[in-house]
Amino acid sequence: MKLNSYHALNQQMISHTCGNGLKICVFPKAGFKRAYAMLAVNYGSIDISFTHDGELYTSPLGVAHFLEHKVFEQPDGGNALQTFAKTGASPNAFTSKTMTAYHFSGTEKFMKNLEILLDFVMSPYFTDENVRKEQGIIGQEIGMVNDRPSWRVYENLMSAL
């Protein structure tokens, strides 16, 4: 374990890298009632090619965002949002250009909520039916984003770089 101090921010970070490469960072906050946890992976909207065991794989555009939505689904027909609600936690997720992150905050049952987070992200549930359903939802989101002029300007600027 490693302890980093950020004196200008009056903050410390405890970090550890597990044998499987998972990096864990803890930011202790004395006096805080609410706890937060985030699991982030280096797979975002621009990541369409990757190498595994020496073999190159390419995925279609939008897979990271699609997976962000999909992993919330559970085999019992429910979803992780409902499971978190039972513990009083507030979950969410986002996909950026370079990562996908799942997170929650809550005032109690931190370890139970962390278990829920790790379980639904690390053991996703896919069926042909729920994949088809999600494809339609993602299509609607793309349409909504494309209706925002500020987003289109941003995307055009980024593509010009």
Predicted regions and their residues:
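His/Glu-rich zincin catalytic helix
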Residues: 1-79
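Acidic/histidine-enriched segments that form metal/cofactor-coordinating
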Residues: 75-161
